Every structure is written in C-alpha cells, then in structure tokens.
Design a protein with these regions (language model features):
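Short, acidic/hydrophobic/Gly-rich beta-strand patch recurrent on exposed beta strands
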Residues: 25-30, 161-165, 232, 361
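Internal alpha/beta scaffold segment
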Residues: 170-213, 235-259
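Terminal RNA-binding accessory module
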Residues: 1-78, 374
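Extended interfacial segments that mediate partner engagement and assembly in macromolecular machines
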Residues: 63-73, 80-203
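Short, aliphatic-rich beta-strand segments
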Residues: 219, 225-234, 292-296
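Short edge beta-strands and adjacent turn/loop segments
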Residues: 210-224
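Rossmann-like S-adenosyl-L-methionine
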Residues: 2-13, 18-23, 238-474
Length: 474
C-alpha cells in the first residue's frame, strides 16, 4: 500500500527579501531559507511548501497580501508556466542590479577574489525579441494550465507547439506568442501548427510512446535578414513532408534556408543527423563589425547577436592586443572570437571539442580572407598540453570561453605552465568561473571584471574577467 505524503505546511504573510540563484526569490522563516519562484523582493505572500529539507525549503506563492513596489507587470501571457523569462515581474534595472550582485557574490564568496575593478554591467538595448534562435516542440500531450484545469472542461485536442514544461519531458506548453524572437518566428510556428491540424496525416509527436510524424521546429534569424527554418519529422513520408514544406515556402518567401531532418531516434537532438535542404541555402550569414559568419543548423552562435558583439568587444579590449601577440582561443566554437580578434593579433590558435564547429571556424576565416588563424579539434585537456605549447609557441594572451562547468583541472594546469601575460576569461557561469579563478590565482591577479547581460528576463549573466600574470618578486 502506498503511503500518503505528509502535507507540508502553509506559511502565511511571509515577506520576500532577496533574489537567489536559478531565478528564485528568498524568504527567511524561523532561520530557514525558503526559495519561491515568480515573486519579487517586497512581496508579502502565503507560501505553500512543496519541499522541505533541514536548512531550507521550497514553495510556491498561493496568495499575495501585498505586491512589492519593485515589481513590474509581466508582458507575456505564459509567464509563470513557461520555463523561460522568469524575471518578467522585475523591472529591468532591478534584473541587472541582481545580476551584477550575483557576479560579485560568486567571485568573492567562491573565488575569494580581491577585485581592483568591477565595471557596471552592460545591459541589453533590447529586452524582447532579442534571440536569433528558438526551437519548438510538437507534442500530443499539451500541458493544461491551472486555469484550464479549474474550468473542468474536456479538451478534444491536446496537441501543442511550444516549450517543454520544466521537469516534464513529455509535456509541452502551447505557445500563442513568444516575445523572445522576431515576430516572424510566431507567424511561422502558428502557420505550421494550423496546417498540421487542418490536414490529415500530421500527428504531433508522442515522446513517451515514440509515435507521431511532426517533431520539432527550429527558427534562426540573422541581422543580415537571412532566415532559416528546420522542420524535424519522425519518419519519411515524402508526399506529406513536401506538401508541408512547400506550404511554408509559399507562405514565407523571406525564408532563405528551408531544411528538414528525418529523426528516427528517441531523443530530439539532431547533432548526429543529416540536415537536408528543401529550398535555399544550407546556412545563413550573420555579420559583426564587417566580418561575416556562416551559421548552419548545427552551428553554435551566441543567441543574442547584439549583446554578443558587446561581449566580444570587451574580450578584445581586455586582451590588449597590439598586433604582435600570439593568442590562444580556447573553446573557440565556430571561431567567432578567434576571427573577431585576428586583425589585432599576429596569430590566433583556436581549439574546440566539436569537429564540425572547427570546420565552420575554418570556413569563417576563409570567408573573411583571414590568414593568421589555425584551428584544432579535440578534447581540450588532450589537445592543450605542454607538448602542444612547445610545438606551437607560448601564447601572449589566452582567451577562454568554456562551457558552464568551467575548465578541467588539466587545462588550468597547462595554462599555468604556458604563463601568458594576460588571460581573458569569458563565462556563462560566474560560479564555475570563480572556482577556476581561484586555481589560477597562484600566478595571476584579477584586474578587471565586466558583467554582460545576454538574456534579459532570466537570471543568466555572462562575465568577462581580465587576469594578469603576477610579477615575480626579486
């Protein structure tokens, strides 16, 4: 017999005091920290606990007694249900203030860093429609909101096109309007959905039972006006696939790259799948400071193009290049930073784990007639070794932009062996960055810190740190 779960208590008239990691807010009740999403400091609420541990608890707001004066009206109808844009209820100036504080807290608390200078965070000029890439999922298991459940109505159609509900791999929230990407994205998504619902033979995918035809939709935009659409199907049905793709091409002639994938795997990733061109090119072109970057369906490119430019300008400025330096660009991806700084460097060597990304990096150098870059593919800790440095020359500057987990200890040790004059550390996770900075502190001092907001209305923040080699005392 299953045991009944113990009902957790309701906490009444609790004041929210601060913002925490992962975008949640904090309340303190009897020396216990309570994490609550979708509330703002200054809100007075009733909290229904959903999880309780020894020193902390998690809960959700079930009633608002007072709304904080530091609260904004969310602009999206999906706020509070969708997993994105969780900070819409905070004014943007508050968002970037908390992100700035998050960077300081991580560097001082985790990294024990003494900072000479931390610059004001670079906010985003645009706080909506700033993404250049979105992926939507087709599902026959639509997530019903609390309001829909309360109506008691029966829904004949449970098909949805949108985003996965956090923690529910097979449930999808049906998105009416998303504020993250140019409105062409909304129009394409809704048109594809309507076509599939009104034409026979286009069942939405059932991820749990591995059934259905239409799986996912990717839309990529570029500042050049290029537009890529990729539709993913579970199996090949030439007649229906071509009918849908022809409809999309006819309705949206501005699409410059219309592609498709037949993905018969269990999961939705297409990194190991063939992406086939139905109409147009196999890529789009993005531009930055006169440079062109080829972006394919599998390419990594920063999803906020405007702020990516600001981020890379900071990295280049911190690098202090005069034209005589050997630069190593670690975790180079498609070589965006490497190519961006190449005109101010003598030579740039880029290293990246993904072979396809390195091929894109080489293409981007060729596209821009850049001849002073070299790119290598492989696991960073296996490529970047003392032998590699002895063979290719010691770098004057290392720029590193690792994944969220930060750098492997072997990579850090090799950097310490290389002893570049300057290290520019770009990070999407200031906590992991702080840990790495602590390890580098045996030979390097933090000189500048520049947070950059790439993702308005989320808790995520990018951070660029300049480290300089410590002078040896005689």
């Amino acid at each position: 017999m299953a045991r009944n779960k113990k009902q957790l208590p309701l906490l009444e008239k609790v004041t929210i005091t601060d913002v925490a990691a992962e975008g949640k807010a904090i309340a303190r009740v009897n020396d216990m920290v309570v994490f609550v999403p979708f509330v703002a400091p200054g809100d007075v609420i009733d909290i229904q606990l959903t999880r309780k541990k020894h020193s902390y608890a998690e809960g959700k707001a079930v009633f608002f007694h007072e709304y904080s004066p530091r609260r904004a009206e969310p602009f999206c109808e999906h706020f509070g249900v969708c997993g994105g844009c969780k900070w819409q209820h905070l004014p943007y100036e508050e968002q970037i203030r908390y992100k700035h504080k998050q960077v300081i807290d991580n560097l001082t608390r985790i990294g024990k860093i003494e900072m000479e200078e931390i610059l004001p965070i670079k906010g985003s000029k645009h706080t909506t429609f700033y993404r250049n890439k979105l992926e939507f999922t087709f599902s026959n298991k639509k997530w019903l909101t609390e309001e829909e459940v309360k109506t008691g109505a029966k829904f004949d159609c449970m098909d949805a096109v949108g985003f996965h509900i956090p923690g529910m791999f097979d449930k999808v929230l049906d998105i009416h309007k998303c504020w993250l990407q140019n409105d062409i994205s909304n129009r394409i998504r809704l048109a594809v959905k309507e076509y599939c619902l009104t034409h026979e033979g286009y069942p939405f995918f059932d991820l749990r039972n591995q059934e259905g035809f239409v799986r996912t939709l990717m839309i990529r935009t570029a500042s050049t006006g290029d537009l890529m659409v990729v539709l993913v199907f579970f199996y090949e049905d030439v007649e229906r696939r071509e009918a849908l793709l022809s409809y999309v091409a006819e309705q949206f002639p501005e699409i410059t790259s219309l592609m498709y994938v037949i993905n018969e795997k269990c999961n939705d990733t297409i990194t190991d799948q063939d992406v086939l061109v139905f109409r147009g090119k196999d890529h789009i072109i993005e531009e930055m400071e006169g440079l062109q970057f080829k972006v394919g369906p599998k390419s990594f490119y920063q999803t906020n193009s405007e702020q990516a430019y600001e981020l890379y300008k900071v990295a280049r400025e911190f690098a202090g290049l005069t034209g005589n330096e050997m630069v190593y660009d670690l975790y180079t991806g498609t070589g965006t930073i490497a190519n961006f700084v190449s005109r101010q460097a003598k030579k740039v060597i880029g290293i990246e784990y993904v072979p396809e990304a390195i091929e894109d990096a080489k293409v981007n150098s060729s596209l821009n007639k850049i001849e002073n870059t070299l790119f290598y593919a492989g696991d960073m800790k296996d490529i970047l070794t003392q032998d590699f440095i002895n063979q290719h020359g010691r770098p004057d500057v290392i720029i590193t932009d690792p994944p969220r987990a930060g750098m492997h200890d072997d990579v850090i040790n090799t950097i310490l062996f290389a002893e570049p004059e300057r290290i520019v550390y770009v990070s999407c996770n200031p906590a992991a960055q702080a840990r790495d900075l602590s390890l580098l502190s045996v030979k390097y001092a933090v000189k500048k810190v520049q947070p950059v907001d790439m993702f308005p209305h989320t808790h995520h923040v990018e951070n660029v740190v300049l480290l300089e080699k410590l002078k040896v005392k005689n």
